[in-house]
């Protein structure tokens, strides 16, 4: 499976905004031309492509004072009173395999509201990326247990039209090397493909091991992206 820019890829240039205008509208807030998720769901915010000073002001009003805004590939420079917090280079990768991952999903279970404390604990210990008490409401989350303890998980995050992002892929350091991440990503990819959508993901450029895993599973790099975080005045 290969794609060109005529295959609905344009929505992936603004996956946060496209998600908040569509599938995740009920999990976000809007003001003017800006949008953001509810703070207990995610810290991602979206600005229009032709951003103006008024848009930054609208986003600041939406978020409130001293709030965090996590931006996907935002090339625009914020006003000087916005505090830079981080810059992270990464990749956007698309599923380029067939209609199924062929992964073994033995031991994979669906996670629900009752599992959130364990999910937050695993996230805190492995640091795969931002995850909040209501992040699981963005989509399906799957996990693997060992002796009843949650040791690996992954889930669905951004949902631009026709696509589903796989995210929060993490494994307890004590059980790494057993193929848990591959099974979880494969199981999620199969679910996404089965409903007629296409899987994609984002990964930090410095995470060479994860990039290699995703390439083995059937993902290819579409483009390099820069993630930026700012704090409102």
Language-model segments: residues:
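Conserved active-site alpha-helix within GNAT-family acetyltransferase domains
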Residues: 77-82, 182, 205-224, 231
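Acyl-donor-binding surface of acyltransferase catalytic domains
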Residues: 2-103
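Conserved acetyl-CoA-binding loop-helix of GNAT-fold acetyltransferases
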Residues: 53-59, 177-194, 211-216
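A conserved beta-strand-loop-helix scaffold within acyl/acetyltransferase catalytic domains
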Residues: 130-140, 144-172
